């Protein structure tokens, strides 16, 4: 019998998009689904639209709650979920009709505990490019390869976001998303990946990520962006405690590159003082002495040292 997959859909103020999202889930070729929709205090008709679908499909359950943000809505769904596996869909996105069938088949290997697929960005109002699901390639990462971390960082965004993955349910027994923070995936996904004996990556885009005109983050700098640095600091501490120094080194370089980018943006926009980055440069300096242990190449060590000490970027 097919394993039960719990699909968690947090919903807030998406009456224009939610029908397409829900229909893409209920039309999946993989049928053994528990669809948990969390209406996070939507002020529009989103909750009512969700209830309409629940009356038509017994696999759907709708939870209504006071607004707690994306993390709070996901956590409420996790508390309710009873499936063998967990996945998420953002309520303004949609998915390929074969997504769950293709991904759930990969769990036949006992070592595979998380399956990841590629995704495609779709501008609001447009349709995605067609994909040939027969021409996908797969990469299996064992625990040792995950500790090296290279593929995870080569395809960085794909391994940070929550919604292009299917996870073993037990991975969430002691993990929840941080309420009140944006970039919640950056605070959480690495902990889930660290639990896995094996991760399988499928290189075809089965998830359609909608780029809306009213996206949370613009291109400019905002102090909210510093939460990415906070998440990376937590991640560095996590991998240092685990003594996984290769992954730690990759997170360190990621942290450094974000700092470089934010410093440039602050200087060019003149809306914030560079003093806002002082605590983050202190963290960068703290890790300089560990670069050799993190197996960072010499050229990157030099670039990191010069930037940390003199705030100068060399190519």
What residue ranges belong to the model's regions?
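A conserved acidic beta->alpha catalytic loop
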Residues: 24, 31, 39-48, 66, ...
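Acidic helix N-cap motif at the loop->helix transition within catalytic regions
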Residues: 19, 33, 44-52, 64, ...
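N-proximal low-complexity "stem/linker" segments adjacent to membrane-targeting elements
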Residues: 1-26
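Donor-binding/catalytic cores of nucleotide-activated saccharide
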Residues: 70, 91-199, 214-223
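Short aromatic/hydrophobic "clamp" motif used to bind/position activated sugar donors
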Residues: 86
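Membrane-interface aromatic/basic loop that binds lipid-linked glycans or pyrophosphate carriers
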Residues: 266-315
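Catalytic core of nucleotide-sugar-dependent glycosyltransferases
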Residues: 206-212, 219-245, 258-287
């Amino acid at each position: 019998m097919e394993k039960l997959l719990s699909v968690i859909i947090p919903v807030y103020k998406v009456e224009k998009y939610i029908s397409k999202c829900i229909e893409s889930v209920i039309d999946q070729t993989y049928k053994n689904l528990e669809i948990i929709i969390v209406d996070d205090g939507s002020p529009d008709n989103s909750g009512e639209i969700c209830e309409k679908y629940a009356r038509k499909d017994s696999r759907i359950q709708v939870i209504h709650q006071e607004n707690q943000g994306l993390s709070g809505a996901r956590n409420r769904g996790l508390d309710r979920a009873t499936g063998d596996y967990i996945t998420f869909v953002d309520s303004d996105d949609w998915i390929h009709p074969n997504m769950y069938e293709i991904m759930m088949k990969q769990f036949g290997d006992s070592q595979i505990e998380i399956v990841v697929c590629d995704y495609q960005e779709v501008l609001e109002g447009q349709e995605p490019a067609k994909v040939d699901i027969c021409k996908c390639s797969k990469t299996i990462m064992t625990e040792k390869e995950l500790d090296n971390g290279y593929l995870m960082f080569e395809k960085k965004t794909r391994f940070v976001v929550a919604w292009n993955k299917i996870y073993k349910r037990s991975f969430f027994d002691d993990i929840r998303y941080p309420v009140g923070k944006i970039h919640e995936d950056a605070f959480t996904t690495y902990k889930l990946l660290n639990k896995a004996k094996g991760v399988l990556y499928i290189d075809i885009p089965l998830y359609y990520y909608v780029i809306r005109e009213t996206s949370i983050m613009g291109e400019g700098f905002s102090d909210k962006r510093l939460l990415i640095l906070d998440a990376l600091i937590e991640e560095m501490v996590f991998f240092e405690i685990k003594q996984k120094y290769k992954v730690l080194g990759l997170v360190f370089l990621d942290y450094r590159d974000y700092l470089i980018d934010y410093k440039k943006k602050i200087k060019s926009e003149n809306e914030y003082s560079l003093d806002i980055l002082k605590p983050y440069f202190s963290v960068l300096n703290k890790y300089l002495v560990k670069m050799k242990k993190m197996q960072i190449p010499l050229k990157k060590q030099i670039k990191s040292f010069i930037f940390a000490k003199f705030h100068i970027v060399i190519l």
